[in-house]
Amino acid sequence: MLLLKQISPPFHLHQLRRRISTIISAGFTLNLPKLEPSSDAELISQMLITNHNPFHFMESSLQLNGISLTPNLIHQTLLRLRHNSKIALSFFQYLRSLPSPSTTPTSFNLIIDILGRVRQFDVVRQLIVEMDQTSPETFLILVKRLIAAGLTRQAVRAFDDAPCFLENRRFRLVEFGFLLDTLCKYGYTKMAVGVFNERKEEFGSDEKVYTILIAGWCKLRRIDMAEKFLVEMIESGIEPNVVTYNVLLNGICRTASLHPEERFERNVRNAEKVFDEMRQRGIEPDVTSFSIVLHMYSRAHKAELTLDKMKLMKAKGISPTIETYTSVVKCLCSCGRLEEAEELLETMVESGISPSSATYNCFFKEYKGRKDANGAMNLYRKMKNGLCKPSTQTYNVLLGTFINLGKMETVKEIWDDLKASETGPDLDSYTSLVHGLCSKEKWKEACGYFVEMIERGFLPQKLTFETLYKGLIQSNKMRTWRRLKKKLDEESITFGSEFQRYPFEPYKR
DNA sequence: CTAGGGTTAG
């Protein structure tokens, strides 16, 4: 892979062939294990990226390497190209052009998702019409990407039109629930309720659908509406279950303001009320219920209350999960009680739960607050040495830490690690980096990453754009600005008011 | 994609 990287764009087949045979012979002498499909995919996608789509070489180089394009390998390659929509599409078209086309429904759905992320809906529609590989999932993916792009009306229309493409396989309640859930997750709860009311006769309704809508109102901090829907649900004869109540509980606890002590106490009472109501209906609160409350105590930095509550739940015979422990660890870290947090890590391990990157991120967050570069680097090294795989969020906190400290060399080092990691940079990574570079007045570099993030399908925040724009104009970098402007026109991106509405993707687990 | 909890954020 490294050897392939070194071949720069005007390259020749014999060059590529020589490199590949070097790799193969190196493999023999070093006795490397046989390539797995995933590392083959790594090789292919790397080849595609660094050599700017050498499709005319692909077949011969694949043959040389003894690789055959299995459906799984195609899928893996597309996965690795998911942030490079243009190359991914070229690869996909290449697959279609082969004598025996090797696209599968799975790879088809993946390319639809990749294109949807960069809002290439015209291409998506064209592919759906041209190819006969459309499954119900294809439409659900399209629906999700349309909603993510703020095109909710089109999303509902795509949902309605789907049966025409699916030999009249009708969507049922599950798919309807997905539509509503996606609308809610991206903040379009009102629209979801509208759609629900229009079609509840057709699709029916169950506790899941109501839970989705209640969660939607909670997301908008409309607890009053959430409670109204709970009442409506019970009135229409649908029994809420533990998930429904947990959603409501989370709505109350998550966004609850904790500042003046009275408000915090009022929220605690509200949460207790939900617990009481649950028990009245014969539903026992579960680990999730307790974790939600623990999280609220943790946000309020109530270390003692958090620890007591955890004891209480253990006494009730409910075993904490990794989420529960992480909440408590977060609380201890944010109270500066790092030693106790470390002790809790040991307790976790003893009870058979190994900390995740999310757990360790609490420590990184505290190091960031303390501007403790050594603490952060030590833990980071331990993680790299096999303690636990850092997540994108881990990298993001680290980036923030060293940007704040002005240590741009370390930032570069972490960025390279992040680039090489499995998941790669996300919207937040790019945002931090671009803002960091802007604060150092490295406008051209910032601009480069800004363009890169767009190419990878991340929609920058309006603030990021404005910061960069002001910097470029003030420092008279008109040529860079014009290049950027051209890019934005090409991708038809404008930073109007509508862009403030969906700066983030909903969190996925 | 498949109703819910932990990490992140100028």
From Swiss-Prot:
The keyword Transit peptide is assigned to this record: yes
Superkingdom, taxonomy of origin: Eukaryota
Ranges for the PPR repeats: 172-202, 206-240, 241-285, 286-320, 321-355, 356-390, 391-425, 426-460
Family note: Belongs to the PPR family. P subfamily.
InterPro entries hit by this protein: Pentatricopeptide_rpt (IPR002885), TPR-like_helical_dom_sf (IPR011990)
PROSITE patterns tied to this protein: PPR
NCBIfam families: PPR
Any single Gene Ontology cellular-component annotation: mitochondrion
Feature: transit peptide: 1-19
Keywords of this entry: Mitochondrion, Repeat, Transit peptide
Protein name from the UniProt record: Pentatricopeptide repeat-containing protein At2g13420, mitochondrial
Lineage of origin: Eukaryota, Viridiplantae, Streptophyta, Embryophyta, Tracheophyta
Pfam families (UniProt xref): PPR, PPR_2
Species whose genome carries this gene: Arabidopsis thaliana
Compartment list: Mitochondrion
